[in-house]
C-alpha cells in the first residue's frame, strides 16, 4: 500500500445532537490517540471532547468549528502498513453550516450520524444533498440504539425516502433500549457483545447465525428474532458491493451507540477497508490526479486568532497532488 492508497480522509456530519463528536472520540480511542474518550451528553461535557477544544464549545456542548484530527489505524488481525485516517468533525447547527459545507469539498467520503429515535432531520437532508452534488460516498451510522427508539426497518425506509439513496445494512442490532445486547456484524459475520460504559469491546466472536451458540450467548428469543430480521435484510436489500458504495449509489448502514461504544469498532474496521483513498480533483481546466508529482491543493478553511496567546492565522489545505514542503512559497 503506497502513501496515497493508505489515506482515508472523511467528515462526520449530522443534525445537531445526533452524536458526531462522541463518535469522533471513540474513533480517536481506537486509534490510540487518547486513553479515555470524552463525550457530549445533554449539552454537557463529560470529560472534554478532544475535538471540542474552544471555550464556547466546552461551555455549550456543541461544535461550532470543524476540527481536524489524524491517527494511524490497522484493524485487528490485519498485517502491513496501517491506514492514515484523517477525521474532520463538523458543526451540526445551522448557524455554522457554512463551515461544514466548505469541509465537504476537502474529503473523499463522509459518515452520516442519525439518531435512532428521531431519524432523518432537517440538517441531515441538507448535508446529504451536498454529498450527492459532489458525488461523495457516505456510510450511515444509526446511533443511540441503547435508548428506546424506532424500529430499524422503519429507519431504513426513511433513509431511502428522505435521503434519496439506496441503503444496505452491514450490521444489525440485537434488541433495543434496555434490551440492547450488541450488534451482529453482517460484513464480517461476527457477533459483538458489549457492556454499557465500557471503553472497549467486551467480547467479539465469530459465530454462525444458525448455530446453537448464538442462542446461548444472546438468548433464544433474541436469537430467533435476529435470524428472522437478517433473513428479511438479505431478501429486501441488495448484496453489498464496494464499487456501488464508492460511486455513491449505495450507503452502507451500521447500528450502535457511540456513547457506550456499541458498534463503533466494526464501523471503523469496515470503513478503512472500503472507503476511497484520495480521488482526482476537478480543477478549472482539467482533472488533477493525486499521483501527479507537482504539488497542488486548495485552502478550504482559515482560522485567525483562535488562541489569545498566539495571534496567528492557520490555513487548512487539501492536497490534491504532489507533496507539500514547509517554508516553500506556493502561488494561487
Predicted regions span which residues?
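Structural and coupling elements of P-loop NTPases
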Residues: 1-332
Amino acid at each position: 500500500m503506497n502513501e496515497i492508497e493508505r489515506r482515508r480522509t472523511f467528515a462526520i456530519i449530522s443534525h445537531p445532537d445526533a452524536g458526531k463528536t462522541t463518535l469522533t472520540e471513540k474513533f480517536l480511542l481506537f486509534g490510540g490517540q487518547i486513553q479515555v474518550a470524552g463525550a457530549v451528553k445533554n449539552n454537557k461535557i463529560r470529560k472534554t471532547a478532544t475535538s471540542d477544544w474552544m471555550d464556547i464549545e466546552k461551555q455549550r456542548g456543541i461544535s461550532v468549528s470543524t476540527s481536524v484530527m489524524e491517527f494511524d489505524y490497522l484493524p485487528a488481525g490485519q498485517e502491513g502498513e496501517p491506514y492514515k485516517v484523517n477525521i474532520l468533525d463538523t458543526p451540526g447547527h445551522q448557524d455554522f453550516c457554512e463551515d461544514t459545507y466548505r469541509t465537504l469539498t476537502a474529503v473523499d467520503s463522509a459518515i452520516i450520524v442519525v439518531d435512532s429515535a428521531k431519524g432523518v432531520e432537517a440538517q441531515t437532508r441538507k448535508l446529504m444533498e451536498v454529498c450527492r452534488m459532489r458525488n461523495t460516498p457516505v456510510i450511515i451510522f444509526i446511533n443511540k440504539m441503547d435508548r428506546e427508539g424506532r424500529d430499524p426497518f422503519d429507519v431504513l425506509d426513511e433513509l431511502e425516502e428522505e435521503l434519496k439513496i439506496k441503503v444496505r445494512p452491514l450490521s444489525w442490532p440485537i434488541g433495543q433500549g434496555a434490551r440492547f445486547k450488541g450488534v451482529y456484524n453482517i460484513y464480517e459475520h461476527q457477533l459483538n457483545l458489549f457492556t454499557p460504559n465500557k471503553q472497549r469491546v467486551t467480547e467479539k466472536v465469530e459465530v454462525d447465525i444458525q448455530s446453537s451458540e448464538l442462542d446461548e450467548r444472546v438468548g433464544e428469543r433474541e436469537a430467533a428474532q435476529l435470524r428472522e430480521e437478517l433473513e428479511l435484510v438479505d431478501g429486501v436489500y441488495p448484496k453489498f458491493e464496494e464499487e456501488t458504495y464508492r460511486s455513491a449509489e449505495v450507503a452502507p448502514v451500521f447500528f450502535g451507540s457511540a456513547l457506550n461504544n456499541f458498534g463503533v469498532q466494526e464501523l471503523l474496521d469496515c470503513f478503512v477497508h472500503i472507503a476511497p483513498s484520495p480521488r482526482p480533483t476537478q480543477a478549472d481546466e482539467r482533472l488533477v490526479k493525486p499521483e501527479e508529482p507537482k504539488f497542488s491543493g486548495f485552502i478550504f478553511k482559515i482560522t485567525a486568532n483562535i488562541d489569545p496567546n498566539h495571534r496567528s492565522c492557520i490555513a487548512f489545505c487539501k492536497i490534491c497532488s504532489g507533496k507539500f514542503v514547509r517554508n516553500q512559497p506556493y502561488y494561487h
